[in-house]
Amino acid sequence: MSKSENLYSAARELIPGGVNSPVRAFTGVGGTPLFIEKADGAYLYDVDGKAYIDYVGSWGPMVLGHNHPAIRNAVIEAAERGLSFGAPTEMEVKMAQLVTELVPTMDMVRMVNSGTEATMSAIRLARGFTGRDKIIKFEGCYHGHADCLLVKAGSGALTLGQPNSPGVPADFAKHTLTCTYNDLASVRAAFEQYPQEIACIIVEPVAGNMNCVPPLPEFLPGLRALCDEFGALLIIDEVMTGFRVALAGAQDYYGVVPDLTCLGKIIGGGMPVGAFGGRRDVMDALAPTGPVYQAGTLSGNPIAMAAGFACLNEVAQPGVHETLDELTTRLAEGLREAAEEAGIPLVVNHVGGMFGIFFTDAESVTCYQDVMACDVERFKRFFHMMLDEGVYLAPSAFEAGFMSVAHSMEDINNTIDAARRVFAKL
C-alpha cells in the first residue's frame, strides 16, 4: 500500500469519510485521495514523493502559486507579534482600505472567516435591510453550506448526488427560490409570483461550482434590472471569481454593479478569510451600527489579515491578470485541439484564471442542465489518467480548474502533451 492509502485508511476511522471537506475524498472520481506533503509554485508533492502540476490551487486561493514568499514572510512576521487578540488592529483597517480600493462597489466591508460566513451574513443583511424573507439562487450554484443555500446546490453537493442536503428543514428551504442559471425568464417568473417578498438574488457571476459556466451577455445586467424593478438587492458571490477573473472581480469584467459582494479564497492568500461588503446604507444596517447581527471570534485576526494584505498587494501588480488569461487561454485551446485530434467531443470553458472541462457532444455548456448531460464516467477516467501523467485536476466533473501566475508556459504545454497522450487512450 502507498503512504496515501495507509493514511486514508487511518483517517476514515477518525474523520467522517477520511476528509474534512467531502470533495477531497475523491468521491466524484473514485480511488484513494492523495495526501499532500508540501507545495511550491505550481506544484504539489504527495507523501509518496510524486510531483504534480496543480490546477486545483487549494480550490482557488493560490492565484500566486503555492508558498509565495511575500505571503509566507507576512504570516511569519505577524505571528511573532501574536496570533489573535479579539480586538481591533491596524492591519484590519489597512485591509479594509485595500479591499474597498480594489473593488469600488464596496463602500464598506466586514471581514469574516470563510466564504460560507460571507454569503450567510450577506443574505441575513439583505433580509434585514429589505424586511423580506425569500431569496433567489440558481440551480447548480453553490454559496457555502448555510441551510438556506443547500437547495439545488452545486460543488460537493452535486458530486455527492445530493442537491438538497438532509438536515435542512423544509421551513428554511421554502424561502429559497431556485431559478435556472442564464435564464432571465425564470427569474422574472419568480419575481412576478412573489413581487413583494424577495429580499435578494445571490449569484455566482461565473458559475464555478458546476464546473465553469460563464454568464451569457445579457444575464448579469438582466438580474440587476430585475432587482431594481422589484426592490430586491443583488448579491454577487465573488468568493471564487474575486481578484481572479479581473482585479475588481467578475462584476468589473462583466460591467454589473451589485448591492453586496461576497469574497473569499484569494482574499486570504491561503488563510481562512471571507468578507462581504457593498453599499454604505446597506452595510450601516449591520451591528453594531444597525440591528442585523453578525459576529466572529477570529474575524479579522492578524495572521489572516497579514496574509490577505500581502496577497492582494501582489495580485494588484501590473500584468498579473494578463498572465493568468494568457496561460488559461493557451491551456483551453490546447486541450480542445488535442481532443479534436483524438476525435473526442470536448467543451472547455474559461474566464480569466478559471477553466472547466466538459465531455459532451453539445456545442456549448451554459447551464445546470447542460452540465448534468456531460459524460461523467469519461471524466473519471480522464482524471485518473492525467493523475498518472503528473497533472492534478479537480477530482470532480463539477468543479472548476484554477490557474496561477506560478504556472509556466512549459507547464501548460506539458499538460497539453499529457492530455494528448490520455485522449489517444481514452
Curated annotation (Swiss-Prot):
One of its GO terms (molecular function) is transaminase activity. Keywords: Cytoplasm, Isomerase, Porphyrin biosynthesis, Pyridoxal phosphate. Its EC number is 5.4.3.8. Pathway: Porphyrin-containing compound metabolism; protoporphyrin-IX biosynthesis; 5-aminolevulinate from L-glutamyl-tRNA(Glu): step 2/2. GO terms for cellular component: cytoplasm. SUPFAM superfamilies: PLP-dependent transferases. The keyword Acetylation does not apply. Homodimer. Belongs to the class-III pyridoxal-phosphate-dependent aminotransferase family. HemL subfamily. This is Glutamate-1-semialdehyde 2,1-aminomutase. It comes from Escherichia coli O7:K1 (strain IAI39 / ExPEC).
